[in-house]
Amino acid sequence: MSSSALQVAKTATYLPDLVEVQRASFKWFLEKGLIEELQNFSPISDYTGKLELHFIGEEYRLKRPRHDVEEAKRRDATFASQMYVTCRLINKETGEIKEQEVFIGELPLMTERGTFIINGAERVIVNQIVRSPGVYFKDELDKNGRRTYNANVIPNRGAWLKFETDKNNLLYVRVDKTRKINAHVLMRAMGLSDNDVVDKLRHPEFYQNSIDSANDEGINSEDQALLELYKKLRPGEPPSVSGGQQLLNSRFFDPKRYDLGRVGRYKINKKLRLTVPDDVRTLTHEDVLSTIDYLINLELDIGGASLDDIDHLGNRRVRSVGELLQNQVRVGLNRLERIIKERMTVGETDSLTPAQLVNPKPLVAAIKEFFGSSQLSQFMDQTNPLAELTHKRRISALGPGGLTRERAGFAVRDIHPSHYGRLCPIETPEGPNAGLINSLATHARVNEYGFIETPFWEVKNGKVNKEGNPVYLSADLEDECRVAPGDVATDKDGNIIADLIPVRYRQDFEKVPPHQVDYVQLSPVQVISVATSLIPFLEHDDANRALMGSNMQRQAVPLLRPERPLVGTGLESQVARDSGMVPITKVNGTVSYVDANEIVVKDDHGNEHFHYLQKYQRSNQDTCLNQRPIVKIGDKVISGQVLADGSACEGGEIALGQNVLIAYMPWEGYNYEDAILVSERMVTDDLYTSVHIEKYEIEARQTKLGPEEITREIPNISEESLNNLDEMGIIRIGAFVESGDILVGKVTPKGESDQPPEEKLLRAIFGEKARDVRDNSLRVPKTEKGRVLDVRIYTREQGDELPPGANMVVRVYVAQRRKIQVGDKMAGRHGNKGIISRILPREDMPYLPDGTPVDIVLNPLGVPSRMNVGQVFELLMGWAAANLNCRVKVVPFDEMYGAEKSHQTVQAFLEEASKQPGKAWVYNPEDPGKLLLKDGRTGEPFDQPVAVGYSHFLKLVHLVDDKIHARSTGPYSLVTQQPLGGKAQQGGQRLGEMEVWALEAYGAAYTLQELLTVKSDDMQGRNEALNAIVKGKPIPRPGTPESFKVLMRELQSLGLDIGVYTDEGKEVDLMQDINPRRNTPSRPTYESLGTSEYEED
């Protein structure tokens, strides 16, 4: 193989642990965060001060969870541990101390994979990016075009304090966006004399106006200032000095009400160059005076003072699981505090114990609410391992305390220079969330303050020092350095070769000689996220298409026989490993036993380590999770080695699709507008066949008329339909079921009124009591079929927790194999997506000079305008690799090896491939990368040579089977009486405003009238129309739509006398066709039409 091939493989770097951000945060919560909250919360004293309850936070303990992870999933339980904490109740009068360990609630635990199991479902807590607490200076233009400056002091929790200037050079302050108050009034209220303030300022002359203004208003003393403050903050209440003092203290100086947090204190000290100790979390006089001083320096335009950019990553921080959970625990503890105080006051002082005071309910409720319904607690995307990994590394600006979609402007969503190496500039959703949801870059990590850091190698005198550990820098620190990108060319000793190097310095790009460079990036892929780093030749793709490529890889369905890409980037194995989908041995040793369900590794000391494999389990997205061993008995394994492949993995690497032979050429218009023409080989050889597992569930409930019963005895059902049911009436495992088949037989008792007339007649004649039950069985829905994989039965006797009112729950899992078909969506890794338009027999497909038919024909017009040329590089590199019988790893951004390196490498590979025996035809130097194909139908060659090669193509989760839908009659909405929408409701197709315009433009009046009445909400008309169709009569004239009547009624309810009149001025009664008993069924059926109507006139 040529030297370029070796270089291609050399640049692969190992990434840090990719789920670290989740695990480290939860570990911090257990070791520090929870203890911190319990300590802040204690002691609690009652209103008289006699009793004190202390929580000894560092002595909290967690009990072993009741169920392990797998058991919790099976039982629909939460994988959680009980929290106990030691409490001390001190009676101040008697000196008596009672100590007791008290249960304070259940805490869901994180699994090894960084997820939580809540009610049996795997969930992920997404990281949130919020504005960091601290002090921010910004400028605004007033209505006269004059620039004014303001300073905001933002705490972690508590009131915002804003200082601003006006055109008269007066300083004002606002508390929580209320009315503005003269800044000196606040200074006096805080007990500072004029001299105290003036001494601290570098330019007191600017501040003199504010002092004079306060004196003019007659506010000369602390008491008057407190009164004024109270008047402004609590208008309408009688002001008092003590009230003012209490208000000021509670707003800014009470640690329970005001908290800057560790980060806020760190940021304020850094910005204002203070040395206030780290544990002072409230505002100090020094903070306020320094803020005013800095603001005056900005006004006077004196060096050293700078404005803040709120979108800079130095001013935004990440809140991960631990911190979000800590905030929730604080909410729960505050609710608990009120309860404890009440109980202390009400209870008998002598007999009270800590356990009687502490009620775990508020804390449990707060934690449950967080995991169950917070915007940041999300149902994990388990479509494939990459989707799972990306979900755990997602960073959202939405959620409580963050932004809302509507309010977020362009600036927040935009890529900021400080994102470099921290947040991926490419991977973000399309649509309303663009830029608000980001992904962490590959090498980024979150530091103790919540700021994102990225690693660099140090550069000394033009030499890159790769010894030891890299240096991690946050965005603030990096701004002060000159940083070169990761693809800078160096010689073998690490000296930078070029004379001028492009560097980033203070968010600008400039070129400097090598000796001025401070740091070099670790790797070329450190700028982008994990999903984006799996795209080969990424640097040749337009960013919009790379974004689609990143997002679509997460939607690839795991296939039956996955195949790793011929052309990869070298990160595939790390993604598979860190996603948690592949079992990994933690010891060195030998494999002593292997079967489909478990692998046993014997370590060097003779101890056995068991690894149980997942077999055909259903994921959150109904795809199939299955693990297959890749080691044999007797194999030597080392710690960290992969033992088995998970779904969408092969050989320990992620394998989302198949390598297929692709030709870029038009074919009879079947690949017009991104459509895809595929060969029948894809279907027959199961290349794109995937397994999907559906879950069906039924409850037997206690009803007013008696219990529902799960049974085989179902009324009016043939014996044939019950063939596959066991004696309990539950389907047997392994049975093949189609739509409408019974999965679980269930009968419900029915009341007298439910009986049809013939049954009443029978009972009247014979006194015969037919079984008073109704068939309510669980059946396979329309369009579904498959094989029963598993049946689970839950009853109270077995100790299962059932929903209230249920006696028994049965769950049936049905697996189906879905082959690829017309209408399925496929995509490459470069954002080149399309829908299958036709499946052609392989003998009709265009074929290569050696007779091989191609697998897929794509439209060449999909490449130039979209500028994702990476797909062509991948195609040709794959073609060369397939002919050389090897796989290639190409790290993106390869210009460090020379200009146009991708081009040269691909060409060298193709030349190498054509030198193999019998492969001369593979590469034609006259027309590089193209071959003359022949038409499979005629055997004639096509006019022009065609680009052919191997590319990695994915089948996406948007399958036509899940989307195709039709309706004849079905359910109607109760109010508007229009058909419902959507496949799940068996709904109709919406005919919207624009479609009505189109029909109006054509003048298709009758079609339009029919669509708006009979086919929609003319209740009487549609029943008559159905009747007419059944009897073969002409369809009668449509009536009035129900929604028009609803509109009339709504206008009348506003008190408007509104009616409908004919041309002659006669009022039309819209309600005349309504039966007084209103017994028109919501779903017209043949029975409801009444037998009399069928008789011929």
Swiss-Prot record:
| EC identifiers of the protein | 2.7.7.6
Report a single Gene Ontology molecular function.
ribonucleoside binding
Q: What are the entry keywords? A: DNA-directed RNA polymerase, Nucleotidyltransferase, Transcription, Transferase
Region of interest (Disordered), ranges: 1072-1097
Q: Which Pfam families match?
A: RNA_pol_Rpb2_1 (PF04563), RNA_pol_Rpb2_2 (PF04561), RNA_pol_Rpb2_3 (PF04565), RNA_pol_Rpb2_45 (PF10385), RNA_pol_Rpb2_6 (PF00562), RNA_pol_Rpb2_7 (PF04560)
Q: Where is the composition biased (Polar residues)?
A: 1077-1091
A cellular component term from Gene Ontology for this protein is:
DNA-directed RNA polymerase complex
Spell out the reaction equation it catalyses. Answer: RNA(n) + a ribonucleoside 5'-triphosphate = RNA(n+1) + diphosphate
Q: Which InterPro entries match?
A: DNA-dir_RNA_pol_bsu_ext_1_sf (IPR042107), DNA-dir_RNA_pol_bsu_external_1 (IPR019462), DNA-dir_RNA_pol_su2 (IPR015712), DNA-dir_RNAP_su2_dom (IPR007120), DNA-dir_RNAP_su2_hyb_sf (IPR037033), RNA_pol_bsu_bac (IPR010243), RNA_pol_bsu_CS (IPR007121), RNA_pol_bsu_protrusion (IPR007644)
Q: GO:BP terms for this protein? A: DNA-templated transcription
How does this chain assemble? Answer: In cyanobacteria the RNAP catalytic core is composed of 2 alpha, 1 beta, 1 beta', 1 gamma and 1 omega subunit. When a sigma factor is associated with the core the holoenzyme is formed, which can initiate transcription.
Q: What does this protein do?
A: DNA-dependent RNA polymerase catalyzes the transcription of DNA into RNA using the four ribonucleoside triphosphates as substrates.
Q: Give the family, as the similarity comment puts it.
A: Belongs to the RNA polymerase beta chain family.
- What protein name applies here? DNA-directed RNA polymerase subunit beta
Q: Which organism is it from?
A: Prochlorococcus marinus (strain AS9601)
* Gene giving rise to this polypeptide: rpoB
